[in-house]
Structures are given as structure tokens and as C-alpha cells.
Amino acid sequence: MRKFFIAILFLAIAVAGNAAETLQSPDSKYNFVFEQKDGRLVYHLDYAGKQVVEEGELGVNIDNHLVESAMGIPVDNSKVWTQGMEVIKVERAAKDEIWNPIYGEYSSIRDHYNEMVIHLMKGGNHDNSGNGYDKRQQYLFDIIVRAYDEGVAIRYHFPEATNGLFMHITDELTSFRLAPGAEAYHFAWAQSHANKVKLLKSEKAWKEEAERPLTLQLANGLYAAIGEAALSDFVRGKLKLKADNELQMSMFQSADIITAYDMPWRFIMVGEKTIDLINNKQMVLNLNAPCQIADAGEWIRPGKAFRVCRLDKKTLYESVDFCVDRGLQYIELDAGWYGPEMKMSSSALKVADNRDFDMAELCAYAKSKGIGVWVYVNQRALYQELDKILPLYEKWGISGIKFGFVQIGSQEWTTWLHNAVRKCADYHIMVDIHDEYRPTGWSRTYP
């Protein structure tokens, strides 16, 4: 990998009172300002001298009263968990790096940003030394802000605390208050129609939360997109209308974490034209960790697949030949090859008895022609048999699995899904995720 790296880490700066902290993008177009206002954590965002976010709130709400009571720690009865937090210090850094994806539109991607980490605390004192368990009501909370030339991203980090508390996050406070007149291209789910609506409670569309990324046309003529990056073990976020002209991140449900922990990134990118938002999409990849598959370039091959629904031997072998003639790279066996996909009793460890082909022989024939084989497997079978499926499919010579009808949204299913992808990588099996899954750039980490 060809890369250059410039990192500047300034010494921690003690912050007193409610002093504002500013962060700019490398090209100085984005200007992010953090401050404390009436005990709340808020920010403002401009782009090229034009206002983007008038004011937005930062933070989460946490209900830890059961754990606090059980561990003999004073119960935090705050209505807003981040109310009255103290800024301990602010750290700044900059990074400029080139990395090379193994596929996609670009052979190289620049990861260039300025970063500000705001360290906050509530309860206890500044002494976090020692390894022993203590019973102080002390919570640590970091706000990480990155300013790219492509946009600005915010992440919440929970450092490990000496009192060892688990965190039960009930909702997220992150909001985006825009100037009156902004309009959103609202869509509620993957295959729904996008409606251009004003950010007003009177608009019927806002009875449902908006999917992300959400595209906006601002009153000053700019376009913006709000989205989520690096989601792998948290609940899915959507956007709800908190008040007229004010959007708020909405969690699918509550989440439980163990510190130290990073929440997903929330980002906003801005452009003079809508095409600018598309051209800046690489920022979403940059907000994710580098590739974790050492030999990814040796076996991950993008390509076009021919979907086969008539699952008999003659059709499957003819489909392989069709791919050769048409310059396609894969065939994909659709639902039904191992039995009724919606039945928990259907095992994806063997071809259904009413089928007349052998999977290993099919894969061998396809390989001899330079064609790979994908198979559809419903989540019901994946959930029950994944650890048995993967070594078998690698032995058969399967190239990839199309995950069917996966559950999404909850922390449980989000974590399960991403762990399943990790396991597939261990057996050199590619993954295509069906249905309501929303990419958040994790394909950089696991291409």
C-alpha cells in the first residue's frame, strides 16, 4: 500500500468555563464550533461562509439507575445525562494518508482531516489513576469531531471508567437545527418513494422517520446529506423531526455497551450542487477502520452475477456457459436450492432431495470455466448453521453467499450480521446482503 502520513498531536489544552472550541477542515471551508450553553453541549456549522446548522445538540441519555444501585454508586437522576458535564481538556490532531481499496471507482483514496477530541466528565474528580474499583459517581464522555474537505463527522466515545459501570443508552440527543425553508428528500425505508417535504411538523411524511443518508436542500441554496458511518455493533439510526426545521438522530431502540466503546459516526456533508454529495462519498469509507483481511486482494473479486431461479442440473450448467459467453463472472443460485427458505427445518448443509445436481460438482465445473458460484441462504438457516455452513461451502468451492431477509435495526441483529461477515471472511467467502441493510462504509474494513 502506498501511503503518506502526517500526524500532529498537540498537548492537551485545559479548558475553563464555557469557552468555544473551533475546528476547520483542511481547506478551511467547513467551520465547526462547540460550546456549552445553559448546561447543554451544542455546536454550530458553517460551509464557505454560509450557515448549515444554526445550532445542534450533542450527547446521549443514559439510564443506569439499576446498575448504580446494585453497585452502591450514587444514582444519577439527571433528566438529561449530559447536562452539566465538565470539559476536562481538548486534544487536536491532523491526518493525511493515502490508502488503496481492492475494488471500486478509485485506485487510491485520500484520508485527510483535522480532528478535535473534547474530553468531558461528570461526577467524581480528575483523578482516574489506579486499577481498583471505586464507588464514585464518575462518568467519562468524549466527543470526537473530524473535519474533512468533504464534510464533518461526530462520534461519541466512552472511555473506560474506574467504577466499571455498564451503560444503558436510552436515546441520542444529536440534532441539526436548520434555517427555515429547508426541504428534505424524505423516504422511510429502502424501497419507498422519496418525497420532497419541508421540515415542518404539519408535513404528513414526518409521521415516519427518515432513512439515512437524508438529502436536504437548504434555504441558502446549498445541498446537504446527513448520515451514519461505521455501524457494526450498535442500533441503527434514523432521523426524526424534533421540531420545525430541527432533525434529530433516532435510535431503533435502547442499547447496552461496556466501556471503552465507540458509537457510530454521524456526518453531514455539504455541496453547491447535488453531484458534490456523490463525489464526496469516500468520506464515509474514511470514517471506517482499514481493511482487516490480510489476503483480501487474493480472493475478493467483484463482478456481475447471473441469477438462476430454475434450479435443475441442465439449467445450472447452461447458465455457467451463458456467463462465459456473455463475459459475466458468477452464477447465483436463488432461494429453494436447499428447501423452502422460510422453514426453520430447511438445512443449507445439503442440496434439497428434489434437486438433481451436486453442489461440489457444479462448483468444479464452473471453476473450470472461470466462473464463480454464489448461493442464496435465508437468515433462518444462517442463524442456526453458519459455523457448519462456512467450512462446508469452502470445501465445495462456493464463492459467496447472498444473505436473505436479514433482520436489521436492533443492536442484537446488527452485531450478529457483522460478526457473520467476519466469519465468512475467515473462510474466503464473499457476502451480498439482501433487503433493508444500509451500508455505512464498513466495506473498507471488510470489503
Model-derived segments and spans:
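Short amphipathic alpha-helical segments and helix-helix/interface helices
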Residues: 173, 213-215, 320, 363, ...
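Aromatic- and carboxylate-enriched substrate-binding clefts and catalytic-loop regions
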Residues: 335-447
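Hydrophobic h-region of N-terminal signal peptides that target proteins for export
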Residues: 9-18
